[in-house]
């Protein structure tokens, strides 16, 4: 039953049944004995030691004084002025309607 199932699967995969039967009939080749290879030479890499940074107190690390604070802050504007700063009104004053001459 297993051979029939194997043949059906092989036929479905596109293999010829004769090639599959020949493949299954042959006994697997014995594994070749492996010779022990010489171990690879290991190279040792030396680490480069970096210079230690200067030690600081913990508070000095946390509270850096910004040089930007010394600069003058930009002038504050209202929100609407920020939005419409670049817009100019291009409307011309409305002309009075032409009145018919009576």
UniProtKB/Swiss-Prot annotation:
Compositionally biased residues, Basic residues = 80-90
Endpoints of the signal sequence:
1-21
Which UniProt keywords are present, listed alphabetically?
Answer: Periplasm, Signal
Q: Does Thylakoid appear among the keywords? A: no
Q: Where is the composition biased (Low complexity)?
A: 22-41, 91-102
Matching entries from InterPro entries are given as: Acid_shock
- Residue ranges annotated as propeptide are 22-58
Give the stretches traversing the membrane: none
Q: How is it modified after translation?
A: Proteolytic processing gives rise to the active protein.
Q: Name one GO cellular component term.
A: periplasmic space
Residue ranges of the region described as Disordered: 22-102
Q: Does the keyword Manganese apply?
A: no
Q: Where in the cell is it found?
A: Periplasm
Origin superkingdom: Bacteria
What role does this protein play? Required for growth and/or survival at acidic conditions.
Q: What is this protein called?
A: Acid shock protein
Q: Which organism is it from?
A: Escherichia coli (strain 55989 / EAEC)
Whichever gene encodes this chain, its name is asr
